[in-house]
């Protein structure tokens, strides 16, 4: 109460609010120092990757393109084809979809005719053992350096698919930024 009365008295004598505040705070102790939180945008690294893809597209006149080699009827490939499209579009890659091919030869012909920079095989774990080796062989016979990707990660089949020539797997547990950055580098995108 005495402090309040002293402040009122000082104001009546012409003291400013700033002067009163400074006079009152003389006896205050320094409080805790709070370090501000550093702002970080989680989307930043993805945006940087996408900008690198855009820069390459402007420089070369050609956007890195991935062909989805969808195998079999719609119910066999749709889930993985939709996942793959969204996965690749995050980085700014163009994605060419395809109707489900009935044969490996049809899928290889469509993929090669598309002129895509990479091919992603989309089907089910159960069908991959009979599809992947002959499809990769057919693709590489015409384009030995073609980047071949597989939608999914069939754990028991990974080594066999890598031996057949699959370069990378895209799946729900993949580190999307890391995988997309590796794919971009293999397609010639400079960071």
Predicted feature descriptions by range:
Residues 1-191:
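Domain-level signal for soluble alpha/beta catalytic cores
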């Amino acid at each position: 109460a005495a402090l309040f009365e002293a402040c009122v008295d000082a104001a009546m004598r012409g003291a400013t609010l700033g002067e009163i505040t400074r006079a009152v705070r003389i006896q205050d102790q320094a409080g805790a120092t709070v370090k501000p939180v550093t702002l970080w945008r989680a989307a930043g690294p993805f945006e940087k990757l996408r900008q690198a893809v855009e820069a390459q597209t402007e420089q070369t006149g050609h956007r890195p393109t991935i062909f989805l080699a969808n195998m079999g009827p719609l119910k066999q490939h749709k889930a993985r084809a939709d996942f793959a499209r969204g996965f690749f579009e995050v980085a700014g890659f163009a994605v060419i979809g395809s109707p489900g091919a009935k044969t490996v030869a049809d899928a290889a012909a469509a993929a090669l005719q598309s002129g895509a920079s990479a091919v992603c095989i989309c089907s089910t774990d159960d069908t991959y053992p009979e599809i992947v080796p002959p499809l990769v062989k057919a693709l590489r016979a015409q384009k030995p350096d073609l980047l071949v990707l597989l939608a999914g990660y069939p754990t028991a089949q990974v080594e066999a698919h890598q031996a057949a020539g699959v370069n990378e797997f895209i799946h729900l547990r993949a580190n999307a930024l890391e995988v997309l950055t590796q794919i971009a580098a293999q397609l010639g995108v400079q960071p």
